[in-house]
Amino acid sequence: MAFVEQEELIAIRRQLHQIPEIGLEEKETQAFLLNEIDKMKQPYLQVRTWQTGILVFIEGKNPQKTIGWRADIDGLPIQEEVVSAFQSKRPGFMHACGHDFHMTIGLGVLKELSQQQPDNNFLFLFQPAEENEAGGMLMYEDHAFGEWLPDEFYALHVNPDLPVGTISTRVGTLFAATCEVNITLKGKGGHAAFPHQANDMVLAATNLIQQAQTIVSRNVDPVVGAVVTFGTFHAGTACNVIAEEATLSGTIRTLTAETNEQTQRRIREISEGIAQSFQCEVTVHLDQKGYLPVVNEPACTTNFIEYMSKQATVQFQQAPVAMTGEDFGYLLSKVPGTMFWLGVASPYSLHSAKFEPNEEALLFGVEAVSGFLKSLDN
């Protein structure tokens, strides 16, 4: 018997969509979730909070293990361009990565599983700060899970390129490890007519960007792969003034932790070499936080794939590796488990101001996930 209806899920998702909040500031989101969870009161259901995160524990009748489900809750600093009756009420902020879907499905699955006391324990994690602060790592390092730490952990991420009704994953690495790169070069400014009296940081920075691309082409095993992308470059104040300072920011994406460490090391070496070559100062800040590769544990994932492949309502696809970053990789480095894609058929990509996932995926997601988690309780 299903306890969740599509209309209920759509209403919840639309309310959440209107109140996006960035990492560790999700106070209204947390209050909304706690109110919904309070409606599910059961003597075997316990709730804890950690900053803006929520942990819900369903105590089993005869627990042999604890099974975890994670949904991230933060939004993005993006001005929404989708015009609707439920568009974001917060200027400059949007649920452009589908975390409103993740929360709604998480609530739906929690409602389904909490109707009757299961045999095993279940932990539902509504996790803050996936996008900016690696909230999963922060919670783990702060011992937020305590005795509720799962023996297996599962999570999904919406995928705009897959049709509704599709689930996709793979054994092993699914998503990349990421690392933020911030570099500042400082030389000597001057008049454009007298370059010999100055030390041009535009020239130094462009050389650094070009040399950084040799990491991928000449240092990293081509079979393993990596991406080094600089997304911002700021220098100078006028067309006839040689820039004294240049700042760069970018990202490293790799499919293994080892390659990420190698790439970080080469970024530092190249930056120091540029500083010596151009006789300038350089500051390099590399911040990986908890964005480790998402590695799906073989036994958990094989079981998940076998289950989903047998469901008549599910179109299962083998997923290719993606350079997407996800802090669930940190939790999977501590607890075995699986992450997977859920198709939501949006014409626009994740992090797009026009991202508009199909709400028909909500009930499908609740039914598919609930069925799978219940199968683990047998």
UniProtKB/Swiss-Prot annotation:
One of its GO terms (molecular function) is N-acetyldiaminopimelate deacetylase activity. It catalyses: N-acetyl-(2S,6S)-2,6-diaminopimelate + H2O = (2S,6S)-2,6-diaminopimelate + acetate. Its EC number is 3.5.1.47. It comes from the Bacteria. SUPFAM superfamilies: Bacterial exopeptidase dimerisation domain, Zn-dependent exopeptidases. Keywords: Amino-acid biosynthesis, Diaminopimelate biosynthesis, Hydrolase, Lysine biosynthesis. InterPro entries: AcetylDAP_deacetylase, Amidohydrolase, Bact_exopeptidase_dim_dom, Peptidase_M20, Peptidase_M20_dimer. GO terms for biological process: diaminopimelate biosynthetic process; lysine biosynthetic process via diaminopimelate. Catalyzes the conversion of N-acetyl-diaminopimelate to diaminopimelate and acetate. This is N-acetyldiaminopimelate deacetylase.
